[in-house]
Amino acid sequence: AKLRLAAALTLQKSARPAQLQLLMQQVAAEKDDAVHSALSLALANLQLVDTSPTVRLAAVRLLGETGDPLARTRLETLLEPSVETDPTVRLAAETSLAQVKRKLMIGEVIGQVFSGISLGSILLLAALGLAITFGLLGVINMAHGEMLMLGAYATYVVQIMFQRYAPGAIEFYPLVALPVAFFVTACIGMALERTVIRHLYGRPLETLLATWGISLMLIQLIRVVFGAQNVEVANPEWLSGGIQVLPNLVLPYNRIIIIGFALFVVVLTWLLLNKTRLGLNVRAVTQNRNMAACCGVPTGRIDMMAFGLGSGIAGLGGVALSQIGNVGPDLGQSYIIDSFLVVVLGGVGQLAGSVTAAFGLGIANKILEPQIGAVLGKILILALIILFIQKRPQGLFALKGRVID
């Protein structure tokens, strides 16, 4: 199919009248949608210069069926009386142009929704760990975004190791980077909780300032070790390319896999929190810390493990983010605010709320950006979230229980 598509694209520019019958046969026989659209456009290009209005009319109708962006350009030129003298052909061109615009609009909307879901999956991975730590400890961890960044740099280091010591298996380095990034960021998160945060419980302003300072230290450490410039993390072949859904819509493989990976992490997190003893203890401490301690739950150890879990999930998000964006020292700063918005909007400590809020914010951002711009879109979304929180402070999904600290 790739070879046929390349040949069809070449024919769009270099097809000759002698190839007209062959093109008509190929258009009738072709089953692949992308190749069929390209061949149809090549055929229409030949027919549009025919002296017969009937042939040109058939070409105009064929262009309307393709839904290709190039067809839109060709049809717009035909609306000029100086280009097309036959009024019947011009009228058909108007109809076909409206048909093409409608198909292109559908492709753009689907593309925006898909981009929003893709962005939402990254926000979900970033906010999932934050929902656990913020819900359990009530700690505003401003260094959480740097866990994303550390996960991305762990992926970069794993890639370098594969390039040096196992170049034949370089295609599998992201699979190895996942546990490495989780382990590294989880250990850093647990160390952070044991050395700094556990001394600041109940003092939110001091915790915020301390974690913000730690985030700056981590950023400077990465700049010293790896440099201030972005590093290159290459996609393996199985994460390159995409699926051609419509002429103006390609769904990249890396984003499709990241969406599936984010949902997989959500399922694993739900199972961990609802089907294991650790999860039971985490939920108990979240709902009533003092009562859980009276029942023998080691709250200090649970705090440390939950913080490590949340940081590890953020590290997994960094692995995913390294496959679709630039990896640099300031990577985490771009996602920390949106992560907090997801947690607050979804409801503290609620997985279902985090999933709903992450995908909702992602789709809203991508739909509003082309309409009013990225900055105004962010402002509008923030204003709507503030209004929503005023009416429903507990978020979309609230913890249910008789006593909540």
Describe every region a protein language model picked out.
Residues 1-101:
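Soluble extramembrane regions of membrane proteins in the secretory/endomembrane system
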Residues 113-157, 191, 195-206, 283, ...:
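Single transmembrane alpha-helix segments in multi-pass membrane proteins
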Residues 144-191, 371:
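Membrane-embedded helix boundary and interhelical linker motif in transport proteins
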Residues 146-150, 200-223, 262, 331-344, ...:
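Pore- or pathway-lining transmembrane helices of multi-pass membrane proteins that form conduits
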Residues 168-215, 221, 356-361, 392-393:
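Alpha-helical transmembrane segments within multi-pass membrane transporters and channels
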Residues 174-179, 304-319, 323-385:
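Transmembrane alpha-helical segments in multi-pass inner-membrane proteins
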Residues 200, 206, 210, 225, ...:
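Cytosolic-side transmembrane-helix boundaries in multi-pass membrane proteins
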Residues 250-327, 356:
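Helix-loop-helix "hairpin" substructures at the membrane interface of multi-pass membrane proteins
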